[in-house]
Curated annotation (Swiss-Prot):
One GO CC term on file: proton-transporting ATP synthase complex
InterPro entries, sorted: ATP_synth_F1_ATPase_gsu (IPR035968), ATP_synth_F1_gsu (IPR000131), ATP_synth_F1_gsu_CS (IPR023632)
UniProt GO MF annotations: ATP binding; proton-transporting ATP synthase activity, rotational mechanism
UniProt keyword Ion transport present: yes
Gene source species: Latilactobacillus sakei subsp. sakei (strain 23K)
The protein's name: ATP synthase gamma chain
Subunit structure: F-type ATPases have 2 components, CF(1) - the catalytic core - and CF(0) - the membrane proton channel. CF(1) has five subunits: alpha(3), beta(3), gamma(1), delta(1), epsilon(1). CF(0) has three main subunits: a, b and c.
Keywords, sorted A to Z: ATP synthesis, Cell membrane, CF(1), Hydrogen ion transport, Ion transport, Membrane, Transport
Ranges in a coiled coil: none
Family (UniProt): Belongs to the ATPase gamma chain family.
Gene coding for it: atpG
GO biological process per UniProt: proton motive force-driven plasma membrane ATP synthesis
Topology in the lipid bilayer: Peripheral membrane protein
Amino acid sequence: MAESLMDIKRRIASTKKTGQITSAMQMVSGAKLSQIEKNSVAYQVYTDKIREIVTHLAASQLIDIARQKSSLQAEPADSTIKKAIKHEVTLSNLLVERPIKKTGYLVITSDRGLVGAYNSSILKAMVQMISETHQSPDEYAILAVGGTGADFFKARGMNLTYEYRGVSDVPSFEEVKQIIKTAVAMYDNGVYDELYVCYNHHVNSLTSGFRAEKMLPITDLDVSEVADQNLEYITEPSVDDALDAILPQYAESLIYGAMLDSKTAEHAASMAAMKSATDNANNLISELSIKYNRARQAQITTEITEIVGGAAALE
């Protein structure tokens, strides 16, 4: 049954309203993206500097000395999550690789939809990675940041150890500090033996890609980065005290940097999704307008024909 002119007009009006909403949401996402990109650039300066300091220590063999001392002093880790989370992270646990009995995954997703394939790409990659790597839920622990991921893992009966919802659109370190410290403390307490942060990495406004970065233990320092620099250090009060202060900050900075990157990708995905929705609304309005004009033209033609026919009948 053909649509009436009134039905077409209602669809045009409804689509225009939807397009206005998605256009406004696109602009909001664009503003959030711009803000978090500025924050990310500023934070990268801090991350680069603390990495440089830690790499200097590695190149000057201070970390190697501490690692050797720590490996002799390290005690078996308590693997129960019920143990009270420490506030002081053990230096030996951050530096020394141990047998991998359990892997931790800090998975970052959004709390809401309307972000295109942002969440689905992360969750699909996580399911594939876990199924290929682990034989049972006892071999991994999931820490979910974002309601979408938490609900997904719960619905599938996967080993969800920790969840956090409600991260703001432009998170500060103070806001997410407890998430980061909890993840590091769980590793320190032996809840898992290595920690990966899994998220969508922001490439540009149109592109992002899944990443699973190993954050703990700290083993990815490349001393060649500072090979041509002066590496003589005078440490006060001791090497261990310096590393006790710097290494937890370094680990936390890596995780926070990943969270900023993930939020940047989320806003970019939201902006792209809303732009696509707005474009689709505009295209649909154009199609409906053409359809309306044709229907109106046909109606006018019919009316003229009826008038002419009626006039001819009266002659």
